[in-house]
């Protein structure tokens, strides 16, 4: 049944999507969540996906199955073993198969079959994504419910702090130290990313440092598949390491390693056994990205660019990058049929331009009900707040200069100790957290990426503060309370 209401989720889709990314990655996300929810006999049915003028919307589905809480509980408690034995090996097998695809080479019929195989693999990979993420989230709720039974809910973040561990991106510290040792730190610290990379390549010490950076960004052993968010047309860190170099710049400006400020809290004896089962599962909520999201998206992007190169070489497209303006079904058809792709590209480009000018609608279809998402998902998505107030997500009070970040180009303006104000964050932003004084996001709940990582760093954070990016002037001094969610302009 078609959803009656379609909601925006700016915490995950803050910007417009290109037609190809929307009909490959975004559609696979919706299908994967639905398939995983069925396998787990979950109390919700997932969602369908659609875009309008490039803006993404989700329509929630009712489950077509009977909810069985025992299935999801068992999946949560056995997730670490399933991850090691099944999910992680399979997702890497998918990524490696995608890397082996060469769309430029085969004749048309075989190229179409290769495209179909790519789509099968992407769908499977995002089903695996949710077979990990949903049990990981449920593990946290199992632990939280037992904690509240024993100790009450006076501190809503207390059970999650017990599950989380202090985070430190030691590789960033190592790269910053090596830049100093090789006397190239001034290039990383003082130049824009592209200019820094060019200057580093001009000297032997610089090239040596770039090789070490390359190890960190390796798609298999490193984080090369990171980007500021999941849109497939965006360059990844392996192609242009903007986020990484900005994190190293902040580390250099800070003068030395930044140890995490948070410390692990002792686990009460009554919770020790459940904690031992739930903590490793919950850890996968964040760490899975290095095995599924980063390498999988990078491999998918490279395959789709291969099809773009093929069509550009055949003269069907003016440029390889125009492939992002083709919906998946159109790209598939173009491999074996003669289509006027230039007209389609022009039409889609005009739609995106119109969407950028008009902005997103708050919803499509019927007005949303008060509780449109299942409660299990609300702590991840958040329910929105009000300007200059949100949900306290990581305890502590921070006072400092607010730096409003609307795009990746704004990262260069962030200085050590400033309070980052942004619509949302993704796991790719994690290296930046180490140098911040505080964090405010317009979206997300207390189990969102921003909230979890802020607690791991001991970084005061407020999430779900709707309108914060427009209500807080860039450069203003603010005070945030990561317990109450209060934000005060000074």
Residue positions per predicted region:
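Acidic, glycine-rich flexible loop/linker segments
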Residues: 402-409, 413-418, 423-490
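Contiguous hydrophobic, helix-prone segments at protein termini
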Residues: 1-392
